[in-house]
Amino acid sequence: MVLVMDDEESNNVERYDDVVLPGFRFHPTDEELVSFYLKRKVLHKSLPFDLIKKVDIYKYDPWDLPKLAAMGEKEWYFYCPRDRKYRNSTRPNRVTGGGFWKATGTDRPIYSLDSTRCIGLKKSLVFYRGRAAKGVKTDWMMHEFRLPSLSDSHHSSYPNYNNKKQHLNNNNNSKELPSNDAWAICRIFKKTNAVSSQRSIPQSWVYPTIPDNNQQSHNNTATLLASSDVLSHISTRQNFIPSPVNEPASFTESAASYFASQMLGVTYNTARNNGTGDALFLRNNGTGDALVLSNNENNYFNNLTGGLTHEVPNVRSMVMEETTGSEMSATSYSTNN
């Protein structure tokens, strides 16, 4: 936007360099940097606002540059002169007091909005501490923007291409670069690592919470165990399994359910016959784990406990309710543990 003022207004206006524009952010695109800002600098056309400072960045280490910039929080822009490193060479000198800048690849062309012309070149560089032989890579990065020069004729068309050879010969004995190569815009920034460290959380067993079904109150409900815990518990109780007897069972409770509650200390919510009589499932509704007893194992447990006629110890109540099909649901047993 161009501001036009009459003489009276201009006398009462602060200097442009002293004006701070609240909310202003400088985020130019690559095309805007080379086609507007860099081109105006090469043509010696100044701007009313000093958005990009003129600094020889190779006289400073990158961590000292942010305080020299006109603005910027994470990116800083500078007009930088491109001095030759060697005579008869267009390669600039990129050595600083504490290290050096090293290119990470070749120049990338920047095209006009209509994508028909190459209007600039972009190079990425990374800063290394120390000297070239033993340099240590840092997180400081730079994007260098420059206009195409006569030596970059393959990137763009030059009206004076026939004079290219003569122009280069005239500059072979000088460290001064052609006007297009004399200045570059350098964007300085520090690369941040987005990888966040993740804490290693140790895995632990979480005991399930038994919901209140509003049908019965439990003062001391035994904890449901996972199948692995049940099998481990079985191995410690093998010497306490009672000898089988021939007396008929006097309880409607299934032998396997009694074995689970008394021999293993397991409180289970659902005893399910799968419809074929092949297996009895003891399901832990809190975790989804299950202890599956095969038909042979079920018969074995029936033989072990089927003849018991005495009162079942440590059992207060048992409510049985028949459901459709071959399913039988039994409420959890309450113990005096």
Curated annotation (Swiss-Prot):
Keyword Methyltransferase set for record: no
GO cellular component, one term: nucleus
One Gene Ontology MF term: DNA-binding transcription factor activity
Subcellular location: Nucleus
SUPFAM superfamilies in alphabetical order: NAC domain
PROSITE patterns, sorted: NAC
Occurrences of domain NAC (ranges): 20-191
Primary residence: nucleus
Keywords: DNA-binding, Nucleus, Transcription, Transcription regulation
Superkingdom in the source lineage: Eukaryota
Domain-related comment: The NAC domain includes a DNA-binding domain and a dimerization domain.
Name of the protein described by the UniProt record: Putative NAC domain-containing protein 94
Species of the source: Arabidopsis thaliana
